């Protein structure tokens, strides 16, 4: 059988590309090295619950056209991701915002929070992730919410990691724990695997 396109990888990108090709009359072969489709967005149903096997994925965009497009393939239930971090027996709001700074220092205004961070900010040569983090948010935030998490994630001390890993660290001087700033945020009610299947119109993956 002849195909116009061979798509390697049945994640969101590959599935959307496939759907667009098929919509324009092309024949597409989709292959994936894993024994399932969906890439890292793959969901499997366990006791009626759609489990995100590779960690939670929240779809988010400010583009109405994109939002309307994905909702053709499943209803994306609105969901606001507001994670919490546990450190030293206390919980802290993420991403770093005024709730976080109030929990850390008892401050209630952006001016107070900025003043503390400015005093603690590292101003030397940036040599590694530790320096970069301290330059961005100061010592307290680094020691409480970045150091141990980063070491666990990378299995290395932050001073042994390159600075570029944490160059874009979101810091908000407002009471807003919404992880994303996009207008549209949600999770497909039937899981991402259902979305991928709907996009590529197959019942079983080709391996």
Predicted regions and their residues:
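A short, basic/flexible loop-to-alpha-helix module at the beginning of a structural domain
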Residues: 1
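Histidine-centered active-site/metal-ligand motif
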Residues: 57-60, 201
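A short acidic, glycine-rich active-site loop
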Residues: 53-57, 185-186
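A conserved short coil-to-beta-strand element within the FAD-binding core of flavoproteins
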Residues: 207
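N-terminal Rossmann-like FAD-binding beta1-loop-alpha1 element of flavoenzymes
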Residues: 4-30
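Glycine-rich FAD pyrophosphate-binding loop
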Residues: 22-45
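A conserved beta-strand/loop capping segment in the N-terminal third of enzymes
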Residues: 42-51, 59-111
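Active-site/ligand-binding neighborhood in enzyme catalytic cores
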Residues: 85-93, 99-203
């Amino acid at each position: 059988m002849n195909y116009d396109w061979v798509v390697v990888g049945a994640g969101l990108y590959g599935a959307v590309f496939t759907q667009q090709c098929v919509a324009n009359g092309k024949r597409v072969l989709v292959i994936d090295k894993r024994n399932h489709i969906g890439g890292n967005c793959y969901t499997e149903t366990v006791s009626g619950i759609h489990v995100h096997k590779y960690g939670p994925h929240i779809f988010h965009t400010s583009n109405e056209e994109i939002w309307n497009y994905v909702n053709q393939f499943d209803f994306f239930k609105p969901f606001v991701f507001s994670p919490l971090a546990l450190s030293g027996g206390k919980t802290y709001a993420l991403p770093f915002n005024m709730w976080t700074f109030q929990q850390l220092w008892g401050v209630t205004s952006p001016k107070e929070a900025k003043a503390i961070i400015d005093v603690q900010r590292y101003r030397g040569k940036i040599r590694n992730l530790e320096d970069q983090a301290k330059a961005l948010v100061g010592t307290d935030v680094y020691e409480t919410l970045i150091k141990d998490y980063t070491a666990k994630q990378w299995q290395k001390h932050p001073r042994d990691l390159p600075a570029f890993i944490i160059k874009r660290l979101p810091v908000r001087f407002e009471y807003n724990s919404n992880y994303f700033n996009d207008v549209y945020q949600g999770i497909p009610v039937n899981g991402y695997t259902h979305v991928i299947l709907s996009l590529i119109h197959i019942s079983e993956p080709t391996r």
